[in-house]
Amino acid sequence: MTTTRFAPSPTGYIHVGNLRTALMNYLIARKAGGTFILRIDDTDPERSKEEYVDAIKQDLEWLGITWDKVERQSERLDRYAEAADKLREIGRFYEAFETPTELDLKRKKQLNMGKPPVYDRAALALSDAEKESLRAERGNGVWRFKLDQERIEWTDGILGDISIDAASVSDPVLIRGDGQVLYTIASVVDDTDMGVTHVVRGSDHVTNTATQIQIMAALGHGHPEFAHHSLLTGPQGEALSKRLGTLALRDLREAGVKPMALLSLMARLGSSDPVELRTDMAELVDGFDINRFGSAPTKFDAEDLYPLTARYLQTLPVATVKSELDAIGVPADTQEAFWAVAKENITTLKDLEGWWILCRDGAEPLIADEDKEFIAEAMTLLPEGPYDSESWGKWTAAVKEKTGRKGKGLFMPLRKAVTGMERGPDMSALLALMQTVRARG
């Protein structure tokens, strides 16, 4: 059975970059009729917060991304300890004691000599007595996995054939000196224990994947299929990493972005398929194909979400926005007509209130100097109301007959006087909703 996972760290709110990873894994699982696991990477007790666990779940639920089970790494520490013991037994795990300053100095020396900055495995030469002395002086060391210095190869679902020389990679630290288990080994143990068959993540994890493949092999396991998607950039190709804090899903939700607009964009971004609005998740699942994604950096512009949101709102029946209409005071018997007019002229639901204020209170007239006499005369022909769908046609016909104006010279000044805008909804429908026309006096 196809099994995928999304493994966020509860150290902050998830953003569009996280969503891209979550969505790809979710769509693969759902298309195959498989299992999607939400795995909380909470092995860092200082930075992990329960409020962020709740927030992650809320954001995924808002989007309609459902999971089949939840796993928490903090509840699996015994399994990671077992894996570490096995690596020690087979001679693939060793303790190292260098300080960050010492490691940095080594890296600088290697770079100055034109060599790759790879850990030199000096700790392997330490005697037991030297290790005891260092522990007494510095405390417990970190535990590194000893890589076999050979090429690590796999066929990536997006990047194609990958080959990495392990000799160019430092032996990864899997356990810190304070005993904290790091992502690299926790993820390996979880993926094998949980039967994960496909792992989709960012291309910044490629080297990590290479080391994890060796760790899995050392523990006696094969590895899942890997696919590494491109990283997001800003609209001008600039690094997006520094802006991701402003692109949290809850911020987009607060700004009025609708889930299907966001999902429609993220499901196609970086693929050879055009971005098209989809109105339900089943359509996204059916149309998803990991093979259509490329390796080039992918531009993301949050502004693209608003036209998609506007188009999505146009598909909604009035019943789905009743609570929003109630909140701004639209009478129940007016809601259907108001929504029919407003939905074609809003970007987000936040825009509804402005249109209702216009209908309820009227608009500040926009009248050019050369049209003042014309508008004054036209307003004498506009009855008090209430208005209906025929009022605009009858009024403009009367104004045309009285003034001789026609076409744009007739309709545009009247629209601007009534609505304060040069463009907007069909005036027959809008005037029927208006309770006040300020230009009438």
Curated annotation (Swiss-Prot):
HAMAP family, per the entry: Glu_tRNA_synth_type1
**Motif segment ('HIGH' region):** 8-18
Q: What keywords appear on the UniProt entry?
A: Aminoacyl-tRNA synthetase, ATP-binding, Cytoplasm, Ligase, Nucleotide-binding, Protein biosynthesis
Instruction: Spell out the subunit comment.
Output: Monomer.
Sorted alphabetically, the Gene Ontology cellular component annotations on this record are: cytosol
Protein's GO biological process:
glutamyl-tRNA aminoacylation
Q: What is its EC number?
A: 6.1.1.17
- Look up and give the organism this protein is from: Ruegeria sp. (strain TM1040)
Q: Catalytic activity annotated for this protein?
A: tRNA(Glu) + L-glutamate + ATP = L-glutamyl-tRNA(Glu) + AMP + diphosphate
UniProt enzyme class: ligase
Domain of life of the native organism: Bacteria
Q: Where does ATP bind?
A: 242
InterPro entries hit by this protein = aa-tRNA-synth_I_cd-bd, aa-tRNA-synth_I_codon-bd_sub2, aa-tRNA-synth_I_CS, aa_tRNA-synth_I_cd-bd_sf, Glu-tRNA-ligase_bac/mito, Glu/Gln-tRNA-synth, Glu/Gln-tRNA-synth_Ib_cat-dom, GluQ/Sye
Q: List the PANTHER family.
A: GLUTAMATE--TRNA LIGASE, GLUTAMATE--TRNA LIGASE, MITOCHONDRIAL-RELATED
Cellular location of this protein?
Answer: Cytoplasm
Q: Write out the transmembrane intervals.
A: none
What Pfam families does UniProt report for this protein, alphabetically? Answer: Anticodon_2, tRNA-synt_1c
| Protein name per UniProt | Glutamate--tRNA ligase 2
**Chain location of the short sequence motif 'KMSKS' region per the record:** 239-243
What role is this protein assigned?
Answer: Catalyzes the attachment of glutamate to tRNA(Glu) in a two-step reaction: glutamate is first activated by ATP to form Glu-AMP and then transferred to the acceptor end of tRNA(Glu).
**SUPFAM superfamilies registered for this protein in UniProt:** An anticodon-binding domain of class I aminoacyl-tRNA synthetases (SSF48163), Nucleotidylyl transferase (SSF52374)
Molecular function terms, GO-annotated: ATP binding; glutamate-tRNA ligase activity; tRNA binding
Protein family per UniProt: Belongs to the class-I aminoacyl-tRNA synthetase family. Glutamate--tRNA ligase type 1 subfamily.
